[in-house]
A protein has these predicted regions:
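Active-site hotspot residues in diverse enzymes, especially metal/ion-binding acidic/histidine motifs
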Residues: 1-165
Length: 165
């Protein structure tokens, strides 16, 4: 719920890069690590996010939203050590799980899903395609909606390593 409040009331956008810019978070790209998708850290009270330059634009958006989730939900942990993500959509680590739900809720509007599912000709992958969402990100979104009391059938399990492919 926090991501919706942030987006709608304070920043007025779903774009994690725009939100981080408004929050004065320094965002950069790195080609230093081949397997690391992104990481965030705090130094001298400034928050930094680094995203792999090897990723597609779609993956960069997802990683940025995921790292923003860490910044908003787990800020106190940033003071201790960088938060690194070499595999997104990890279901075993609670902080990663929370950042994944945050990213899905930030990037995909509840109303867009409600509108799209009214179309009986649209299957799960058609829904993903129509909303420019990966099937894995959509799984997190539908799981989030289900946790909030809306009934959606999830035809695929949440995969913890889909960006590792």
């Amino acid at each position: 719920q926090r991501q919706m409040c942030i987006r709608d009331r304070k920043y007025g956008t779903r774009d994690p890069f725009e939100i981080m810019d408004q929050m004065n978070i320094v965002v950069g790209e790195t080609s230093r690590y081949k397997t690391l998708k992104g990481y965030c850290f705090m130094s001298c009270k400034t928050i930094y996010v680094m995203i792999s330059s090897f990723l597609s634009e779609e993956e960069k958006m997802i990683v940025a939203a995921h790292e923003l989730g860490h910044i908003i939900l787990h800020r106190s942990q940033l003071k201790m050590a960088p938060m690194q993500d070499d595999t997104l959509y990890n279901m075993t680590d609670n902080t990663e799980y929370q950042a994944n739900l945050f990213a899905a809720d930030l990037l995909i509007e509840d109303e867009d899903i409600e509108e799209m599912v009214q179309n009986e000709d649209l299957d799960y992958f058609g829904l993903c395609s129509s909303l420019n969402a990966t099937p894995e990100l959509m799984s997190f979104k539908l799981y989030s909606l289900t946790k909030r009391g809306q009934a959606y059938h999830m035809p695929m399990e949440i995969q913890s390593n889909f960006l590792a492919k």
